[in-house]
Amino acid sequence: MPLLQVEDLTKTFKGHASLFGRNQFNAVDKVSFTLERKQTLAIIGNNGSGKSTLVKMIAGIIPPTSGRILFNDRELQYQDAQSRAKHIRMVFQDANSAFNPRLNIGQILDEPLSLATDWTETQRNEKIFETLSLVGLYPDYTNLNIKHLSISQKQRVALARALILEPEIIIIDDAIGNLDASVRIQLLNLTLDLQQRLGISYIYVGQDLGVIKHIADTIIVMDEGKMIEYGSPQNLFTDPQTDVTRRLVESYFGKILDETAWVKDKNAH
């Protein structure tokens, strides 16, 4: 039984009104896939392809128009946000706008614990310190205001906030790809380490195919709301079956990859 099962997930938006009524378009159109435990699924595609809309439905931020999302074989209801938040958390793309700038880090991390648990303040503080340590931050960071942190530190806090309820799935919405190379490598290694230690499954949305080649077990390619390809990085990057995938690979790597690109990775490890 897969950890997450998405069946025919669809999101329809209403467009501008016209003489013939209000136009509708499917931002996501009957997308289906599964995610296994301790696996990473990447979602790629051009801007406007439906990637972010898809993961927002999975995270419970927006309701689907139709289709089902099953976690451990139990259907998730959009209205049951509190239950979903314990299992599926999201790290957003822009760390600068992801937090209330008036809060310190302790308050930011305490909020999900206060909402989702009946723990005492002492228990919550212990969990906050433990989670900060997991992402490489010291306990005394709890008293720092979020606005005084670097972008790398903010992303670590965002990851800590996602981790603190011990979810099985974390969605990362392009939160690594836009960072400087050295910071990106640090956070990439951190997420992989946490996956090994805690058994987390990731859904990674992004444009950095170099990162995706390194971390993903499977990839979904989106175009105009539809899933047009699904497979391993090696299959998709060496033998793309659609023009969209081919252009994405060639745009990033400068060419379609061959098998030697993975031999180099194995030797590096």
Curated annotation (Swiss-Prot):
Domain of life, per lineage: Bacteria
GO cellular component: plasma membrane
BP terms from Gene Ontology: peptide transport; protein transport; transmembrane transport
Membrane topology: Peripheral membrane protein
Keyword Glycoprotein on entry: no
Matches recorded under Pfam families: ABC_tran
UniProt cross-references to PANTHER family, sorted A to Z: PUTRESCINE EXPORT SYSTEM ATP-BINDING PROTEIN SAPF (PTHR43776:SF4), TRANSPORT ATP-BINDING PROTEIN (PTHR43776)
Functional note: Involved in a peptide intake transport system that plays a role in the resistance to antimicrobial peptides.
Record-given protein name: Peptide transport system ATP-binding protein SapF
Organism expressing this protein natively: Haemophilus influenzae (strain ATCC 51907 / DSM 11121 / KW20 / Rd)
